[in-house]
């Protein structure tokens, strides 16, 4: 691959054919390393590239994930296969299971024109970076927080998520259990998301029926009796006769 553009990322995708995905500032290209198509020139997959640190691989789907300012995109060797709208500048991306991990740059960098005089790189050390975990399947933000420092590295290992900050700290994140996730959704009255989560996790019918009933109780308290009855009917196996 010959290009005048800076290469911002490299990822291998191994299947029947081993493909190298190459990102530059203005395009995504593929180059077959072994298998059918080996020896052919690199092929442009997308006329939009990404920044350094914004190309990664989903180990579960084997898709290549690209984070841009407008959205997060997934690719296979044939082209784009999915996109998830999430606007804002991105500095780093990584995957944990089927979650997309994103780090956004410090506010002082994204708002550079409005900074007061006398500022310098030292100020950025104390600026906040935003760390976000997206669940594309459920179309929700699973976690978001402001970090008091820039981020040097973002990765997952040993079943956990790690962030290394510019000031030398290592932050570790552990995924909540299924029951803990449900409790959070119940507290926020996100019952439809709770149902979707249960179906995604393929929990048994008894557990799903408990969620239907909780949703029915919530709707009944709100006075939405018809919809509440629909949920009770879905959970009929776990509903005691009145």
Q: What kind of feature is each model-predicted range?
A:
Residues 201, 235-236:
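Alpha-helical solenoid scaffolds that mediate protein-protein interactions
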Residues 138, 159-160, 239-242:
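Extended alpha-helical solenoid scaffold regions that build the rod-like backbones
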Residues 156-157, 220-227:
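Alpha-helical linker/edge segments of TPR/alpha-solenoid repeat scaffolds
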Residues 194, 225-229, 241:
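Solenoid-repeat scaffolds in large eukaryotic assemblies
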Residues 184, 214-222:
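Residue-level signature for tetratricopeptide repeat
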Residues 188-193, 223-224, 236:
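Short helix-adjacent coil turns
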């Amino acid at each position: 691959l010959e290009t005048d553009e800076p290469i911002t990322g490299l990822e291998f995708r191994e299947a029947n054919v081993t493909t190298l995905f190459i990102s530059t500032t203005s395009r995504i290209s593929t180059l077959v390393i072994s298998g059918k198509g080996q020896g052919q020139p690199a092929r442009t997959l997308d006329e939009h590239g990404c920044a350094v640190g914004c190309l990664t691989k989903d180990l579960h789907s084997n898709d290549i994930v690209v984070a841009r300012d407008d959205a997060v995109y997934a690719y296979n060797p044939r082209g784009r296969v999915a996109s998830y709208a999430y606007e804002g500048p991105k500095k780093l991306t990584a995957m944990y299971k089927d979650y997309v991990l994103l780090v956004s740059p410090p506010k002082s960098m994204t708002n550079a024109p409005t900074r007061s005089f006398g500022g310098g790189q030292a100020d950025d050390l104390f600026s906040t970076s935003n760390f976000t975990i997206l669940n594309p399947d459920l179309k929700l933000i699973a976690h978001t927080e402001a970090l008091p420092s820039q981020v040097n590295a973002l990765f997952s290992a040993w079943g956990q998520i790690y962030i290394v900050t510019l000031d030398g700290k290592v932050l570790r994140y552990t995924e909540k259990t299924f029951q803990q996730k449900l409790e959070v959704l119940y507290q926020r009255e996100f019952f439809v998301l709770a149902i979707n989560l249960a179906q995604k996790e393929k929990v048994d019918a008894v557990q799903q029926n408990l969620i239907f009933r909780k949703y029915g109780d919530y709707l009944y308290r709100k006075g939405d009796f018809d919809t509440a009855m629909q949920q009770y009917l879905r959970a009929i196996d776990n509903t005691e006769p009145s």
